[in-house]
Swiss-Prot record:
Required cofactor names: FMN
Similarity-based family: Belongs to the Dus family. Dus4 subfamily.
Protein name: tRNA-dihydrouridine(20a/20b) synthase [NAD(P)+]
One Gene Ontology biological process: mRNA processing
Gene: DUS4
Residues engaged in binding FMN: 45-47, 99, 169, 197, 231-233, 255-256
Catalytic function, reaction form: 5,6-dihydrouridine(20a) in tRNA + NADP(+) = uridine(20a) in tRNA + NADPH + H(+); 5,6-dihydrouridine(20a) in tRNA + NAD(+) = uridine(20a) in tRNA + NADH + H(+); 5,6-dihydrouridine(20b) in tRNA + NAD(+) = uridine(20b) in tRNA + NADH + H(+); 5,6-dihydrouridine(20b) in tRNA + NADP(+) = uridine(20b) in tRNA + NADPH + H(+)
Chain's role: Catalyzes the synthesis of dihydrouridine, a modified base found in the D-loop of most tRNAs. Specifically modifies U20a and U20b in cytoplasmic tRNAs. Also able to mediate dihydrouridylation of some mRNAs, thereby affecting their translation.
EC number: 1.3.1.90, 1.3.1.-
InterPro entries in UniProt: Aldolase_TIM, DUS-like_FMN-bd, DUS_fam, tRNA_hU_synthase_CS
Length: 367
C-alpha cells in the first residue's frame, strides 16, 4: 500500500472519484441496517488525529465510514505545504469523508475540486466551538449563518450532483426549533445527510449529549427523507443501539471513544493489543505521521488497556520511532507484520521478565 499525497502546483486536477455502491457513503448509511443488521458506524473527524494510519485501524474493526481531520480551505487552496501535510490517502482508504473548515463559496468550490478525486464526500464543519474559528466564521459560527451555509451546500451539489456527497456536522442551538429550521433549509439545499452533535456551542464534553434534542430534530425533519447521524457519548458497542433506537438516527459517529478504543464497534470493551501492533505497522508503513501524534495515539489506547502508569510515562519520554519500537520489543511480546498472531492479541503480552510489571499492573487495577 502506498500513500497518495494531493498534487501541488500547476497540475491537471483529475475528475472526482467514481462512486460505487460499495463506496457511496449515502448508500451505506441508508442500507446498513438491512445489509448488516445494525446501524451505520462512523469515525468522526479528530483534530490532528484522524490521519491515514488511524483511519486504516478503525476500518479493521467494523467502522463503515471514516473522516479526515478538519482541513482549512483557505490554507489548503493557497498553500502547497498545507496540501502536502494535511491529506494523505490510498486506494483502501474508502469510504472517506474529507472535512473542511470554510466560510465562503469560492474557497469551498476550489477545495472540493482539489480533493474530490481522492475522497467519497465532503463534510462542512459547523460544530467546532473554538473561539478563533468562530471569529473567522468557521465551525459553530455557521449554524448561526444559515444562508451562507446553505449557499455553500447548494453550490457543491449544483456543480457535482450525485457524483460527490456532501454532509454538514452541526451542533444544536439553545432553542431547538432554530436547529430544526436550519436542518430543513439544509435538506432543501441538497445536503446528503446531517450529523448532529447533541451539544450546544457552550456545552462541555463532560456534560451528557442531549439525545432528546437529536430525537426532536429528527422527528421534525422526517418528511425530508434525509438521514441523520447522531454524535456524542458513544463509548461502547451497546451505545450504538441505545442511541439510534432512542433518537431514530440512521447511525452513530464516535470520536473520543474510538481514540481510546478503535475496536469499540467490534464489541471490544477495552482496546485489544492487536490495535497497538497494527497501528505501529501502519504508522511506519505509510510514513508522514509525526512521532508525537503516534505517541499520543498509543498513549490513549494503552491507557484504555490500563497499562501501568510508570510504563506509560516511559513511553511518553521516548523521542523517536526507533526508540519506541525498541521499547515495545523489550517490554512486550511485540509481533511484526507477517509473524503468526500479528494483530490478533487481546491482553497485554508482557514478556516473561516483565512479570513483576504485570503483577504490579494487576494490583494497580484492583486499587
Amino acid at each position: 500500500m502506498h500513500t497518495m499525497h494531493i498534487p501541488s502546483g500547476d497540475v491537471l486536477i483529475p475528475k472526482p472519484k467514481l462512486i460505487t455502491e460499495e463506496t457511496d457513503p449515502l448508500h451505506i448509511i441508508k442500507t446498513r441496517q438491512k445489509t448488516h443488521g445494525r446501524p451505520v458506524t462512523i469515525a468522526g473527524p479528530m483534530v490532528r488525529y484522524s490521519k491515514l494510519p488511524f483511519r486504516q485501524l478503525c476500518r479493521e474493526y467494523n467502522v463503515d465510514i471514516v473522516y479526515s481531520p478538519m482541513i482549512l480551505a483557505r490554507e489548503y487552496v493557497r498553500n502547497e505545504h498545507a496540501r502536502i501535510s494535511d491529506l494523505s490517502t490510498n486506494n483502501e482508504d474508502t469510504p472517506l469523508i474529507v472535512q473542511v473548515g470554510v466560510n465562503n463559496v469560492a474557497d469551498l468550490l476550489k477545495f472540493v475540486e482539489m480533493v474530490a478525486p481522492y475522497c467519497d464526500g465532503i463534510g462542512i464543519n459547523c460544530g467546532c466551538p473554538i473561539k478563533e474559528q468562530i471569529r473567522e466564521g468557521i465551525g459553530c459560527a455557521l449554524i448561526y449563518n444559515s444562508d451562507l451555509l446553505c449557499s455553500m451546500v447548494h453550490a457543491v451539489k449544483d456543480k457535482y450532483g450525485d457524483k460527490l456527497r456532501i454532509e454538514t456536522k452541526i451542533r444544536i442551538h439553545e432553542a431547538l426549533d432554530e436547529t430544526v429550521e436550519l436542518c430543513r433549509k439544509l435538506c432543501d439545499a441538497g445536503v446528503d445527510w446531517i450529523t448532529i452533535h447533541g451539544r450546544t456551542r457552550r456545552t462541555r464534553s463532560s456534560q451528557p449529549a442531549n439525545l432528546d434534542a437529536i430525537k426532536y430534530i429528527i422527528e421534525n425533519i422526517s418528511d425530508k427523507n434525509v438521514p441523520v447521524i447522531a454524535n456524542g457519548d458513544c463509548f461502547k458497542l451497546s451505545d450504538l443501539e441505545r442511541i439510534t433506537k432512542y433518537t431514530g438516527a440512521h447511525g452513530v459517529m464516535a470520536v473520543r471513544g474510538l481514540l481510546s478504543n478503535p475496536a469499540l464497534f467490534a464489541g471490544y470493551t477495552t482496546c485489544p493489543w492487536g490495535c497497538i501492533e497494527k497501528f505501529c505497522y501502519w504508522a511506519l508503513e505509510f510514513g508522514g505521521l509525526p512521532f508525537q501524534l503516534a505517541q499520543h495515539h498509543l498513549y490513549c489506547m494503552l491507557e484504555n488497556m490500563e497499562l501501568k502508569k510508570s510504563l506509560l510515562k516511559k513511553m511518553m519520554n521516548l523521542k523517536n520511532y526507533i526508540s519506541l519500537i525498541d521499547w515495545f520489543n523489550k517490554t512486550f511480546e511485540f509481533k511484526r507484520y507477517g509473524e503468526d498472531g500479528f494483530g490478533m492479541g487481546v491482553e497485554i503480552p508482557y514478556k516473561a521478565n516483565s512479570c513483576v510489571q504485570r503483577s504490579a499492573s494487576v494490583v494497580e487495577r484492583q486499587e
